[in-house]
Swiss-Prot record:
<dbReference type="InterPro" id="IPR055173">
    <property type="entry name" value="NrdR-like_N"/>
</dbReference>
<feature type="domain" description="ATP-cone">
    <location>
        <begin position="49"/>
        <end position="139"/>
    </location>
</feature>
<keyword id="KW-0067">ATP-binding</keyword>
<dbReference type="InterPro" id="IPR003796">
    <property type="entry name" value="RNR_NrdR-like"/>
</dbReference>
<comment type="similarity">
    <text>Belongs to the NrdR family.</text>
</comment>
<dbReference type="Pfam" id="PF03477">
    <property type="entry name" value="ATP-cone"/>
</dbReference>
<keyword id="KW-0804">Transcription</keyword>
<dbReference type="InterPro" id="IPR005144">
    <property type="entry name" value="ATP-cone_dom"/>
</dbReference>
<keyword id="KW-0238">DNA-binding</keyword>
<keyword id="KW-0862">Zinc</keyword>
<protein>
    <recommendedName>
        <fullName>Transcriptional repressor NrdR</fullName>
    </recommendedName>
</protein>
<keyword id="KW-0479">Metal-binding</keyword>
<feature type="zinc finger region">
    <location>
        <begin position="3"/>
        <end position="34"/>
    </location>
</feature>
<keyword id="KW-0863">Zinc-finger</keyword>
<keyword id="KW-0678">Repressor</keyword>
<comment type="function">
    <text>Negatively regulates transcription of bacterial ribonucleotide reductase nrd genes and operons by binding to NrdR-boxes.</text>
</comment>
<keyword id="KW-0805">Transcription regulation</keyword>
């Protein structure tokens, strides 16, 4: 497993247990190069609904794209990787258990916004400003008033 901090491929498993939700194996790992610890989750591969973009294109659900967008919104915010991973797992679970064969990016985006609102209000506003394509300061003000 590649270290997300330094890119080293030599890591060791420090602890293994079932996730709180019971749908994954949670592993705490330590990098042999930088000595930092990180968490990974091992899950059964499931057939997720196709994601329908605004222009009608269909794509496979991409967990890493979800992680990247949430991580960008949470950049320089004090939110642990474990909390981010748990939020991503909740979103994935909602997408999978919806039973739908397709899901719009707008529906997934709303799920992301709910999770970010729980994790960090600043990240929520950051994500919403891009996701909802804010054009002016009034849109920011309105969203902040809703919080």
């Amino acid at each position: 497993m590649r270290c997300p901090y330094c890119g080293n491929v030599e890591t060791t498993v420090v602890e293994t247990r079932e996730s709180d939700e019971g749908d994954a194996v949670r592993r705490r790992r330590r990098c042999s190069a930088c000595d930092k610890r990180f968490t990974t989750y091992e899950r059964a591969e499931l057939a997720m609904p196709a994601v329908v973009k605004k222009n009608g294109d269909r794509r496979e659900f991409d967990r890493e794209k979800l992680r990247a967008s949430m991580t960008l919104a949470l950049r320089k915010r004090n939110v642990s990787v474990d909390l981010i991973d748990a939020a991503i797992a909740r979103i994935e679970d909602k997408v999978f258990t919806s039973g739908a064969s397709e899901m719009s990016t707008s529906r997934i985006g709303e799920m992301v916004m709910r999770e970010l609102k729980r994790l960090d209000k600043v990240a929520y506003v950051r994500f919403a400003s891009v996701y909802r394509e804010f054009e002016d300061i009034d849109a920011f003000s309105k969203l902040i008033q809703e919080i």
